[in-house]
């Protein structure tokens, strides 16, 4: 039911593992080719125990269930830090409890199971890992992994009988009936020759059949002590002494990042850009102090030496913070991940200096593929992770981390290299990975509800105004098929030269790689396609023949939207004439946007190719041209693309006349007109046009300073971030929360200081006047606000307008006048070039559909995709990136980084620690794979909802496989429960009971259940292991 996890019985766990492996060559969703095989001869020792890799899952969501531990092992985890247990083992936790959007926050800390159930999960995993090692990585040197027990939170609780039973059974389970039961179950399975033959294990028959008797009864020799934030020093020391003296366990004690002190922690977070993370100074007052820790650790190290045991520290615990995000319940939340790294590694440096590198350190605090090599090379080991495994790629990030470590020369290091650690601690304060800006704030999203089926989507495509086939053309570039890539681009994009330079690349703000490292440089790849593919593409290109039966089309305006419309329609055989009042085509791109942003020859390239399709251009046309006149000239369709070429300006008191409007200024600048602006120019506004004006003004002779004045803050600024950064690079200065009021003849510009109030209808906080003013000495002022369409001209043309003065159009841009369309900025105001092309595309698609013409044919590029190859990229982070100057290396890199999400998404599968979401291939759907949710495995942590690009929650909205009737009854999820020959099905809060035969076939399926029943049948026939028993 909902957040109640149902453990898998041991025998059923083995069935699940082997049946999935036989059916899919995967185990818990990890493909066989991505099972990690440790490098022979490289091991690490932790207090006398040997493990084949120094990495593993931290005590947390990845070590709570048996299947989580199995999955960790499959992907390279060999130091398994089991989830913390405590005497209070029946707490009810509010959900969701994880927010891993960037730095991670959580509101849970110990296992959600009772002590008995937790121990049982660890025992199942203990047996399963021994079996998997014998199957896939047999060795004469014994097991390659270490189980490390994690207990908390006070000595009184630890001494209670249930905790004592748990600890004792972890140390020696020989007398526990469960151990004998699981050994007998495993022995029975391995004595079955049919089972061994079915899985190709006959050659290992002898060693496998001897395995059950060899499995040790002691699961742990070490413990990691976890204490609550604010635990008194004497209590921490008492628990450590108890573990060393009474239990004889090698001990790590987990310490808090608060050891650095409030001022230092606050300083580090602020310097790294995480100033919004709220801290309570009094929390630091209650925590262990550094001087107390040093004294305590010295005593405990001496005690451990006396007892011939190991003792060290686990660095670090999470950081307690104020819950100010509103994403999780409660007043406090606990931070981990990359924001914790500079804190934890500096704690490690402080302690290592104090103990001259002789204090063993188990590490977990922002470890990832980007930091793990540096951590390991200091001599710190083991290294465990939780936050990084909650991101897309999931457990596969463990394998990627291990590949980073394989080439290290620090495997034999038996102490901490203090000098090296000091350097790393200093670097951690400035390295890109630890700075907040490393991960953009944009959330990858598809602004539609999560569908029940066929949910694989490339967010880059959905974010694109023209729905460019981005994954496909990137794959073609990676195969050096440049002309094919360009052909595919041209299917939807009439202006690749222009959009390769000045596209707002919404695709990059919605690239799945943002959850790994950085977005693909998609816009630059488009440039490469044109550069490398143009010659071959042009050679095989043929001018459209045209057709006498196609209706003539008139397009008013030869800017980006008009050019795109002409291209799409001429390509389909329509005779097209573009009517332009200027002496050239290109509109704002040609005449307004400064040429330092895009070379004129590239603009002309796109114009010339449109003309090559047979589009006619008539320049110098009368601005009084009307729809009626064009209709009278036998143009069946009329498209109006006149743009927004009017500035509203700004009303100022004062008598200074040196005020220019942005569009006339930029037009004169592009013409090369000698402009006299003086030394200091102020630009009012903060859109892209304002950025162009400020950058252009700085290039005018005599101008020494350009300042942008904006009445809101940087966060509300409408300019693209890229345009803002380029303006900064050019030397443009910015004054936010300032609004001009008066401009006097002596050059005094009076600015009203503003503050931010409540959000407006667009979500931007409204500027509110204060009583404060400031003045600047200014020579010229340029207003870059309020670009709008010329409503008088539109009225004169005969275009119907709505009550707000905008053209009255439908989704395709068609007006209330049949066959008359509005496209580009004139439709709804200033937008991007690619958005203008998008409006042209929608309008021309509507026309071509009316004419019974298919608008594009690119199916030939949608095949030949290997899901296994795509899946291979899922765990990898790009440590270093080549820039685009080396074109061949750049293309190879970006093609290898593309995750082709519309073919293999399964982010919800990746990020689920419990393996509660699965993807299976089901015939008969648009997507090759369908995603199912397994109710029994889910605790509703919310992590899959965080990373799903759709508006929805996979754990609530996907087809759910139920294992128990009570859980089906207590849920509202769409899904099904198989009960022998009956299947209970629920969809849209309506329920059915259907009959299913032994072959998985239904009779008399209601039409609305066709898709769901097709999936149920497929699961019944080919993935029956998903229907196995669970424990109540």
From Swiss-Prot:
The gene is ygfK. GO terms for molecular function: 4 iron, 4 sulfur cluster binding; metal ion binding; oxidoreductase activity. Binds 1 [4Fe-4S] cluster. It comes from the Bacteria. Keywords: 4Fe-4S, Iron, Iron-sulfur, Metal-binding. Residues 928-958 form the 4Fe-4S ferredoxin-type domain. Could be an iron-sulfur flavoprotein with NADPH:O(2) oxidoreductase activity. Its cofactor is [4Fe-4S] cluster. NCBIfam families: Se_ygfK (TIGR03315). This is Putative oxidoreductase YgfK. [4Fe-4S] cluster binds at residues 938, 941, 944, 948. It comes from Escherichia coli O157:H7.
């Amino acid at each position: 039911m909902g957040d109640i996890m149902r453990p898998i019985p041991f025998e059923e766990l083995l069935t699940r593992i082997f049946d999935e492996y036989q059916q899919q060559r995967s185990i818990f969703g990890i493909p066989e080719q991505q099972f990690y095989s440790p490098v022979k001869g490289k091991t690490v020792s932790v207090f006398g125990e040997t493990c084949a890799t120094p990495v593993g899952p931290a005590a947390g969501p990845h070590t709570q269930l048996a299947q989580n531990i199995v999955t960790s092992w499959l992907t390279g985890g060999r130091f398994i830090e089991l989830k913390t247990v405590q005497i209070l083992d029946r707490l009810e936790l509010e959900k969701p409890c994880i927010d891993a959007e960037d730095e991670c926050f959580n509101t849970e800390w110990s296992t959600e199971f009772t002590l008995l159930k937790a121990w049982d999960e660890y025992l199942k995993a203990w047996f399963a890992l021994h079996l998997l090692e014998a199957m896939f990585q047999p060795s004469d040197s014994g097991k390659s992994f270490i189980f490390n027990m994690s207990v908390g939170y006070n000595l009184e609780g630890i001494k209670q009988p249930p905790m004592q039973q748990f600890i004792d059974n972890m140390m020696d389970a020989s007398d526990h009936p469960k151990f004998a039961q699981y050994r007998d179950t495993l022995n029975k399975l391995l004595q079955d020759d049919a089972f061994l033959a079915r899985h190709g294990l006959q050659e290992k028959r002898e060693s496998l059949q001897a395995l059950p008797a060899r499995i040790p009864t002691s699961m742990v020799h070490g413990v990691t002590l976890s204490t609550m934030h604010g635990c008194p020093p004497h209590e921490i020391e008492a628990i450590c002494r108890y573990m060393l003296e009474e239990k004889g366990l090698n001990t790590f004690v987990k310490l808090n990042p608060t050891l650095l002190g409030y001022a230092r922690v606050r300083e580090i977070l602020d310097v790294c850009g995480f100033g919004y993370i709220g801290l309570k100074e009094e929390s630091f007052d209650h925590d262990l102090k550094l001087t107390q820790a040093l004294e305590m650790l010295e005593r405990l190290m001496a005690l451990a030496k006396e007892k011939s045991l190991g003792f060290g520290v686990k660095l670090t615990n999470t950081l307690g913070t104020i819950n100010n995000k509103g994403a999780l319940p409660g007043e406090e939340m606990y931070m981990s991940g990359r924001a914790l790294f500079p804190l934890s590694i500096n704690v490690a440096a402080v302690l290592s200096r104090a103990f001259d590198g002789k204090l063993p350190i188990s590490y977990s605090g922002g470890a990832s593929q980007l930091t793990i090599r540096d951590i390991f090379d200091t001599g710190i080991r083991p290294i465990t992770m939780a936050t990084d495994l909650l991101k897309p790629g999931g457990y596969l990030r463990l394998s990627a981390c291990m590949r980073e470590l394989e080439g290290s020369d620090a495997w034999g290091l038996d102490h901490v290299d203090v000098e090296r650690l000091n350097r790393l601690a200093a670097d951690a304060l400035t390295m890109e990975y630890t700075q907040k800006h490393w991960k953009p704030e944009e959330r990858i999203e598809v602004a539609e509800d999560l569908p029940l089926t066929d949910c694989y989507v490339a967010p880059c495509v959905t974010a694109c105004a023209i729905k460019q086939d981005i994954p496909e053309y990137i794959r073609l570039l990676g195969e050096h098929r440049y002309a094919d890539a360009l052909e595919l681009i041209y299917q939807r994009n009439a202006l690749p030269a222009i959009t390769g330079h000045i596209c707002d690349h919404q695709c990059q703000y919605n690239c799945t790689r943002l959850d790994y490292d950085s977005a693909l440089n998609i816009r630059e790849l488009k440039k490469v396609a044109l550069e490398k593919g143009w010659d071959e593409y042009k050679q095989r290109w043929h001018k459209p023949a045209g057709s006498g039966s196609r209706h003539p089309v008139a397009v008013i305006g030869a800017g980006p939207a008009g050019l795109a419309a002409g291209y799409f329609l001429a390509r389909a055989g329509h005779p097209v004439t573009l009517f332009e009042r200027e002496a050239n085509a290109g509109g704002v791109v040609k005449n307004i946007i400064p040429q330092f942003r895009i070379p004129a020859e590239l603009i002309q390239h796109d114009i010339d190719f449109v003309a090559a399709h047979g589009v006619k251009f008539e320049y110098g046309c009368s601005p009084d041209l009307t729809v009626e006149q064009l209709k009278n000239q036998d143009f069946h369709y009329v498209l109006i693309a006149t743009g927004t070429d009017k500035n509203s300006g700004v009303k100022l008191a004062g008598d200074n006349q040196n005020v220019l409007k942005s569009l006339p200024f930029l037009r004169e600048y592009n013409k090369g007109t000698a402009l006299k602006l003086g030394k200091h120019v102020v630009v009012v506004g903060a859109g892209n046009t304002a950025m162009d004006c400020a950058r252009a003004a700085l290039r005018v002779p005599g101008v020494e300073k350009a300042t942008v004045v904006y009445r809101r803050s940087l966060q509300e600024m409408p300019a693209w971030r890229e345009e803002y950064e380029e303006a900064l690079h050019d030397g443009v200065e910015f004054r936010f929360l300032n609004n001009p009021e008066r401009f006097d003849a002596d050059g005094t510009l009076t600015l009203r200081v503003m503050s931010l109030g409540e959000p407006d209808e667009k979500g931007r906080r409204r500027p509110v006047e204060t009583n404060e003013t400031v003045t600047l000495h200014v020579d010229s002022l340029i207003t870059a606000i309020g670009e709008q369409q010329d409503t008088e001209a539109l009225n004169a043309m005969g275009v119907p307008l709505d009550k707000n003065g905008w053209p009255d159009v439908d989704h395709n841009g068609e007006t209330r006048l049949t066959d008359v369309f509005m496209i580009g900025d004139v439709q709804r105001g200033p937008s991007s070039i690619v958005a203008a092309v998008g409006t042209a595309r929608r309008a021309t698609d509507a026309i071509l559909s009316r004419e019974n013409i298919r608008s594009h044919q690119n199916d030939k590029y949608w095949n030949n995709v290997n899901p296994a190859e795509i899946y291979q990229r899922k765990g990898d982070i790009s440590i270093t990136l080549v820039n685009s100057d080396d074109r061949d290396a750049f293309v190879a890199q970006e093609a290898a980084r593309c995750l082709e999400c519309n073919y293999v998404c399964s982010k919800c599968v990746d990020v689920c620690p419990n393996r509660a979401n699965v993807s299976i291939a089901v015939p008969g759907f648009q997507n090759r794979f369908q995603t199912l949710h397994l109710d029994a495995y889910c605790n509703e942590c919310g992590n899959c909802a965080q990373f799903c690009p759709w508006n929805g929650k996979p754990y609530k909205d996907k087809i759910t496989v139920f294992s128990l009737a009570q859980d089906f009854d207590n849920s509202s999820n769409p899904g099904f429960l198989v009960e022998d020959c009956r299947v209970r099905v629920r969809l849209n809060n309506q329920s059915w009971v259907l009959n299913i035969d032994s072959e998985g076939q239904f009779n008399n399926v209601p039409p609305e259940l066709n898709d769901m029943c097709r999936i149920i049948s497929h699961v019944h026939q080919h993935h029956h292991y998903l229907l196995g028993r669970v424990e109540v």
